[in-house]
Amino acid sequence: VQVPWQQQVSSQPGETTMCRFLLLTAPTPCDMRPFVVQFAQMCQHSTGLYGEGWQGDGWGVAWCDDHEGWQVQRSVAPIWTEIDAIQYLPPTHHLLVHARSASFAHHKGNIAYSQPYVCAPYAFVFNGFLKGVRLPRRVPGTIGAEKIWWLVQEQLAQGVPPQQALETVYTMLERSSRAIQACNMGLSDGHTYAFYNGNPHGQAYYQLYQVRQETLHMVCSEPFGLWEWQRY
């Protein structure tokens, strides 16, 4: 079964762009809105691997409420056009935000495809560029991100620890793909994060980066602001 993945179809030959995501964690609830706004501004000006990029096919944010668990807000508009919506985010200690670059034109405009994906107690984000994926069995989902999330959930349901679950899914995809340029995943249970930076060719555009600002820890698919980001 061939699986479609997050590859941007562009009017400029050879251009490849990818979704962007940001994960933030702090020991106690704090105001994370300024970081989300800066992330949105970065997405507006982000460039692809070979030129102009586009992360304007929708966005979503998931934040953890101490009493009600994961709360989710999604949109099909470019994130930088909805800064006002970001201002309503409450203080939190765990937050994931994702800006989408749709693989195919017919997959645009569907809010169900906007990440993060949530199935308590986990929230999940993905970006990647995989070619010629043929899994040995049919996997639920319409787009590649949904299929990957289903594979991760399958591992978690079997009691596999989050980090190992991401590693196992990457290995599975690696065996089933003609080529992987990138396959990055982030997973949170509202208390801890797990990441997988699948960047086999070591290209900066496909790299995850992290920074610690006092007690705040951020992991992002592209540096922003004036912080000293390090490769994850």
Description of each model-found segment:
Residues Y50-G56, W63, W70-A77, P91, ...:
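Domain-scale activation on soluble regions of proteins
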Residues C19, Y113-L130, E174-Y232:
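Conserved catalytic micro-motifs used in adenylation/nucleotidyl-transfer and phosphoryl/amide-
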Residues S10-S11:
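Serine residues within intrinsically disordered or low-complexity segments
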Residues H45, R74-L89, V97-A120:
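Short acidic (Asp/Glu) patches
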Residues G14-A77, P200:
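Extreme N-terminus nucleophile/cap motif
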Residues K131-D189:
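Short histidine
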Residues C19, V61, L96, I148, ...:
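A residue-level signal for conserved active-site and pocket-lining positions in enzyme catalytic cores
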